[in-house]
């Protein structure tokens, strides 16, 4: 089966206070479009954990200490040709030094055998 990936779903975790800013940046960069609808996204509450090491430059936390933060996990659809631009715009407004980003290829139902 030879299926070409045309769209992906991008997931990113964001501190709750930055969710709207990240959503706006991503959707302004042409992600979140489904048919005739724009700014389409899903947001799920989550609890993030991490320990910044001595070389890290943490957003507001202490180095070498387990941190817990309430986050939103945003997900949105993106055309494969726009992914790099969308990620660039996302990183401009995301407060984390190393945002957690997942990119999942999607298969259109009409492309299934």
Cite the ranges covered by each PLM segment:
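Hydrophobic structural segments
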Residues: 1-113
């Amino acid at each position: 089966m030879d299926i070409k990936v045309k769209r992906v779903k991008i997931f990113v975790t964001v501190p709750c206070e930055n969710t709207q800013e990240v959503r706006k940046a991503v959707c302004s960069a042409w992600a979140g479009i489904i048919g005739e609808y724009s700014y389409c996204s899903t947001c799920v509450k989550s609890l993030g954990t991490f320990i910044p090491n001595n070389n890290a430059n943490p957003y507001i936390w202490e180095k070498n200490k387990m941190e817990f933060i309430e986050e939103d996990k945003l997900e949105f659809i993106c055309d494969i040709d726009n992914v790099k631009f969308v990620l660039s715009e996302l990183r401009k407004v995301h407060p984390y030094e190393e945002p957690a980003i997942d990119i999942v290829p999607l298969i259109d139902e009409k492309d299934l055998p």
